[in-house]
Structure formats: structure tokens, C-alpha cells
Amino acid sequence: MENTENSVDSKSIKSLEPKIIHGSKSVDSGISLDNSYKMDYPEMGLCIIINNKNFHKSTGMASRSGTDVDAANLRETFINLKYGVRNKNDLTREEIVELMRNVSKEDHSKRSSFVCVLLSHGEEGIIFGTNGPLDLKKITSFFRGDCCRSLTGKPKLFIIQACRGTELDCGIEADSGVEDDMACHKIPVEADFLYAYSTAPGYYSWRNSKDGSWFIQSLCAMLKQYADKLEFMHILTRVNRKVATEFESFSLDATFHAKKQIPCIVSMLTKELYFYH
């Protein structure tokens, strides 16, 4: 890879306190007892790509060079997977909330799944609108089982390219379905979410000014190669390995030079996810 300088997607900010949510809802349909999600609805689903590159001067946050490469790569990748892709650029935190609220109110009954990609600066539990921070939980809560009924029991994938802190990883040398007939099931409202983070909790996330972020480059490459062959968690494991072994930061600042990164998968999926059927 060409030695263009790498940047990180971070802006220091006090973390928000997590909220505790109780309760669950019964669902009337769309739940399969098979081991894999039903992906043969008339539509694969929506893929919302929020690409925040330029930030208000008052935030003190730098422009995210290379992010447009990520957005274009993601668009091509998910169109090839038959998703309806909607790209949104430079949204404020209020605009992000409004967009997510409106999308959650759409009828997803003929859609197999939902994907949301967030490209921005971040901290642990935080994504940045162009004018300031937004709690990730605020975004994802619109799609909980008790809030977005037409996506209940369907996979909801959130892909997040952003920093989760300010730690640096120096690295270490190493040797080398079918729906059932039951009328009602009760499932947790937080079930069927998957969060694919670009980096581990507390760490910087790297982005190349020319080629885009390490994580999104790798995710798109692995989806293009394996989406018609492997289950999604297996694909993400290959993404982890690619990022961990094939990338190392290049920076004119010695503090940020020769650093490593490992993505992080947080899954509440209840079945296997295949993009083919």
C-alpha cells in the first residue's frame, strides 16, 4: 500500500451515561425457528450510509479525508448485494436523529434486513454529527423490536467507522428460513442487532487519506469475495484478520507511526445471516 498518511476518527468528549432499558414485546410473524434468517423477502432491505466529512468550525474537528472513498466503496458493495442504498453526506446530529426516526417509521415488511453505516469522528458510545456528539444508542433505539415492528425478528446491522477512544495499539511480533406456524413468540427488544465496529473499545480507528479507512476497505473486499459463500460472522472474522495483519499506520508524527488496529464485532443476532438464499 502506498505510504500516504493515516488519520484517526476521534474527538475527545466526556462519555454519556448508559441508559437501562427493560421489557420485551411479543411478535406475531416473521420469526423462523430455522437456524438462519429468512432472506428471501421481495427486497433485501435498505442500506443507509451517513458520511460525515466536514464539521462545523465550532467543534474543532478536522475534515475526514478519504471518507468519500469509503462511501463510494460501500455504495457499490451493498448495491451488488441488492440493497436499496441511500447516501447522506454531512448531517448534523439533529438531522441524523430525524433521518433514523423517519426510516424506522417506514414499512419494512417486505424487506429482509436493515443496514446502517456511520462514517464519522467518534468516542466510546458516541458518533459525531457535523455540529457535535450524538449517543449511538439514540440512533439504534429507533429500530428496537418494540419501536420498529416491521423489522422485528430481522437482522439490523450497524457498521461504525469511528474512533472509540484515544488508545494506540503498538502491536506485537507473532509467529506465524422457513417461517413457523406458531402464532406468537416473545423475544428481547434488543435482539437481532449486530454492531460491526472499526476498532476495539477505547482505541483510535485509522483512515488513509487516499484509500479510505482500513476497516471499510477490508469489509468491502471481504463482502465482495465471500458474500455468496460464507455466513456474515465468518466474513467479519476475515475482516478482522485482514485489518490486523495487512495494515500498519504511516504518520509523520512518531507518536502515531507504525500502529495497528483490530475491529470489534458485537452481535445480538439470534440466527446465522447469509446474503444469498
Swiss-Prot record:
In the record, biological process GO terms are: apoptotic process; erythrocyte differentiation; keratinocyte differentiation; neuron differentiation; positive regulation of amyloid-beta formation; positive regulation of neuron apoptotic process; protein maturation; proteolysis
Where are the catalytic residues?
121, 163
> Cross-referenced Gene3D superfamilies, in alphabetical order?
3.40.50.1460, Caspase-like (3.30.70.1470)
Q: Which residues carry this modification: N6-acetyllysine?
A: 11
Question: What protein name applies here?
Answer: Caspase-3
Q: Which reaction does it catalyse?
A: Strict requirement for an Asp residue at positions P1 and P4. It has a preferred cleavage sequence of Asp-Xaa-Xaa-Asp-|- with a hydrophobic amino-acid residue at P2 and a hydrophilic amino-acid residue at P3, although Val or Ala are also accepted at this position
Task: Give the modified residues of type S-nitrosocysteine.
Answer: 163
Of the GO CC terms on this record, one is: cytoplasm
Gene name tied to this protein? CASP3
Q: Which organism is it from?
A: Macaca fascicularis
- Localization: Cytoplasm
